[in-house]
UniProtKB/Swiss-Prot annotation:
The keyword Oxidoreductase does not apply. The keyword Transmembrane helix applies. Its main location: membrane. It is a multi-pass membrane protein. The chain crosses the membrane at residues 27-47, 66-86, 97-117, 135-155, 171-191, 205-225, 254-274. One of its GO terms (cellular component) is plasma membrane. Keywords: Cell membrane, Membrane, Transmembrane, Transmembrane helix. This is Uncharacterized protein MG320 homolog. It is found in: Cell membrane.
Length: 287
């Protein structure tokens, strides 16, 4: 009787994982979709808050305050990415770490989106030639790019996919250290040579280089996360035959971590496309 009950429990666990074998992929995209939904909710909330501001001076002050909050949230998110990356394979890790990562991402991108919506729907849009339709086109473009890259990520074989993710991971590690050095150099230049001005070390070397580099790494990040989501699916499938409970736990850790990364890479792609739209408009006006 006891053995029969134990077998039933094991069967229900296996049935859960087998039924959810789409789990990592579908659950990851579900987490990302919910995250983007909350980004929109926060964005519209921030827009309503800023739209009620009576003067441009107060509006600028509020935008700076919200920008500081968004920066702090993005910094917390960056720290949590490193912490949770090392905890991703630890079966004893609580999911609170991964939920915290998603929440920090949603707050950061939600506030940024809210500021953009405010710029596109208030009297400020006349000053910077920025429209609400630009944001819509940026989101549609990012969705199209992401869908295309997701399809391309299915082409490599399993072994080739693992090799590509390892190569991209090394590139991201080096890029992280280079970006830290570039940020420090920019910070020093802004408070010494340029006396409080704002510049970018890449744009000093070659105008527009920061946009090009940002675009390349946005696409690489999208491709990497698409490959890795498929790798996580393979891993959970392996765990399924050995330990269904472990497979279930790993499914949630993977879905939350890479769901957050998917949100981050998607929103970065949106902002990159938005910069392209604005740059193209400014160039067309110049000529």
């Amino acid at each position: 009787m006891i053995n029969q009950a134990n077998n039933q429990v094991n069967f229900s666990e296996q049935q859960f994982v087998h039924h959810k074998r789409f789990s990592v992929i579908r659950l990851t995209f579900s987490v990302a979709a919910i995250g983007i939904l909350f980004i929109f909710l926060i964005g519209f909330g921030v827009q309503q808050l800023l739209t009620n501001t009576t003067s441009l001076g107060t509006l600028a002050s509020d935008i700076r305050t919200l920008g500081t909050i968004a920066f702090v949230a993005s910094l917390v998110s960056l720290i949590l990415y490193f912490v949770t990356a090392f905890k991703l394979r630890n079966r004893n890790t609580t999911l609170a770490w991964f939920w915290g990562l998603i929440i920090a991402d949603v707050i950061s991108y939600g506030i940024t989106l809210g500021v953009l919506l405010t710029l596109a729907t208030t009297q400020l849009r006349e000053l910077i030639d920025f429209k609400f339709s630009d944001i819509v086109f940026a989101f549609l473009g990012a969705a199209l790019v992401y869908g295309t890259v997701w399809g391309l990520s299915a082409l490599p074989s399993q072994q080739r996919r693992y090799q590509q993710t390892q190569t991209l991971f090394r590139i991201f590690i080096w890029a992280f250290f280079i970006s830290i050095i570039a940020s420090l150099l920019t910070f020093v230049l802004n408070f010494t040579v340029f006396r409080g001005g704002r510049t970018n070390i890449l744009d000093l070397l070659f105008p527009g280089l920061s946009l090009i580099v940002g675009g390349i790494f946005s696409l690489l990040s999208v491709y990497f996360v698409c490959l890795q989501i498929r790798n996580e699916q393979d891993l959970v499938k392996l765990y399924e035959s050995q330990d269904p409970a472990l497979a279930k736990a790993q499914m949630w850790r993977s879905a939350l971590f890479f769901g957050a990364w998917l949100v981050s890479s998607f929103m970065n792609l949106v902002y990159f496309i938005l910069r392209i739209i604005l740059l193209t408009r400014n160039l067309s006006r110049a000529f």
